[in-house]
Amino acid sequence: MTTSAPLLCCSIFITASSCFSAVLDRLTYRWSDLNTREVAEWVGDTAHIRQGSTTTELTCKITVEPSEVAFAINSFGIPSQWTSISYKDEADLAKKQQQLRERASTHGIKMLQEGNKFIVDYNWVVNHSTKDLVDVARTIRNTARRKGYRSRRELIGAIASFAQSMEYRIPPDHRTNEEGEKILTAGAMMPLETLTNRWGDCDSKSLLFASLARSIDLVDVCFIVMDKHLFAGIHITPEQDDDSIRYKGKEWVLVELSEAWPLGRIPRDRVNAIIQGHYEVVALD
């Protein structure tokens, strides 16, 4: 998501994030893994399930430290007042914009070269989240294994369906910190915040999935970005009928995280956009 901030002011309605205000202990998560059902055929976006096929239900308990959640949230985003720049001339403006660009990059925000626009630094968010989520990812993996999951694709499906199970809600472009300061987040949340809030949009849920998968070296992940939407690509061998792209000589199976979709299946309108080349790939280093 891209956020534009005017040079002199920023006037977006703010809502406060309070997911770490309550004491967190062991959180229980229950979800269905659609990858375990047997699809007889797809007709457009509708799956016709083979008679007698069932969907595996997964449950796990996860412990999250409130201090870690608070630290993750506070590390991400920049004060809105930073985006109000006073300058003498164009040279002074360019200098101050570069300084802002460098400061923002240390808080997970990219300032674009064209104009005063800000986007999420997906690499920064994932790289600053894997350590916090490794125990969560191991818990999900162990839960799946107890249910008979063995292959890498099956385990990826367990983690993807976990992220998909979070309620779909769009975060605001800003949050308010404990001091009442407006913080620009470009409409995304840190994965720990998404986890404890139990909701997020395509960006935040994809960041949660990528961070979980990367934390246990389960699979390489990239992001596919198109107009007002984002989904993930995973570097595994495509199965028959999987939706996939080829990027830098590798096959990437597509994963829709905003809603419950099986690995390798995305909405048909998104496939048409892919075929027409209306997307870009964000590699996660």
Protein language model annotation of sequence segments:
Residues 19-285:
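A structural boundary/capping signal
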